C-alpha cells in the first residue's frame, strides 16, 4: 500500500490507455498522500477518460489546486487548456498569461506557452504581441537602472613603486 506503487501503476495504466484504472490508482495514491501535482495528473487522466472533457471532477480538481496555490504552474497550464477546449478563450488567455509571468523566457515550456497565448488572442480578435517582448523590455530597463545605481566612479592614484606593476 505504498503511494509510489499506486502512482507507478496509475502511470502505466495511463500509458496503456486504461484511463479508468489509471484514475483509480492515482486516487488511491492521493488517499495516502495529498500532492497537488498528483491531483493535476489525476485531473488530466479523468479528462482523458471523458473524451477530453474537463467538465465535472477534473475542473473541480484544477480549481481546488489553484485555490490552494494560485501560481501552481501545471494547474495554470491545464486550466488554460481546459478553458480553450470549452472555447472560453478569455479565460484560457487569463490562465496562460498568469503562467507566463512565472515561466522564464529560456524555459522549454516558453515557446509552447507563447503559441497558446497567441492562438487565444487571435481567437478573441486581439492584436498579436511578440513573444516575451513586454517582459524583455521591462527587464532591459530594470537592468540598466540597476547598473546605473551600482556604478562607482572616482580617481585612483598609485604610489610610484606600484605604477610599473599595474
Predicted regions and their residues:
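Residue-level recognition of tetratricopeptide repeat
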Residues: 2, 11, 35-36, 44, 72, 81-84, 106, 119
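TPR alpha-solenoid repeat register
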Residues: 5, 38-40, 75, 109, ...
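Alpha-helical adaptor scaffolds
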Residues: 8-69
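TPR/TPR-like (Sel1-like) alpha-helical repeat modules
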Residues: 30-31, 84-108, 115-122
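Alpha-helical linker/edge segments of TPR/alpha-solenoid repeat scaffolds
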Residues: 48-56, 117-137
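Beta-strand-rich domain onsets/edges
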Residues: 133-151
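A short, amphipathic beta-strand motif
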Residues: 152-158
Amino acid at each position: 500500500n505504498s503511494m509510489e506503487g499506486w502512482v507507478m501503476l496509475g502511470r502505466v495504466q495511463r500509458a496503456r490507455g486504461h484511463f479508468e484504472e489509471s484514475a483509480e490508482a492515482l486516487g488511491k495514491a492521493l488517499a495516502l498522500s495529498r500532492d497537488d501535482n498528483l491531483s493535476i495528473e489525476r485531473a488530466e487522466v479523468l479528462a482523458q477518460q471523458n473524451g477530453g472533457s474537463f467538465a465535472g471532477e477534473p475542473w473541480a480538481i484544477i480549481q481546488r489546486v489553484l485555490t490552494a496555490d494560485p501560481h501552481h504552474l501545471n494547474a495554470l497550464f491545464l486550466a488554460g487548456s481546459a478553458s480553450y477546449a470549452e472555447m472560453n478563450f478569455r479565460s484560457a488567455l487569463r490562465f496562460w498569461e498568469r503562467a507566463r509571468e512565472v515561466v522564464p523566457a529560456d524555459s522549454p515550456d516558453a515557446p509552447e506557452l507563447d503559441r497558446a497565448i497567441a492562438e487565444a488572442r487571435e481567437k478573441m480578435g486581439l492584436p498579436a504581441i511578440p513573444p516575451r517582448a513586454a517582459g524583455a523590455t521591462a527587464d532591459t530597463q530594470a537592468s540598466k537602472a540597476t547598473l546605473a545605481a551600482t556604478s562607482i566612479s572616482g580617481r585612483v592614484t598609485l604610489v610610484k613603486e606600484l605604477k610599473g606593476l599595474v
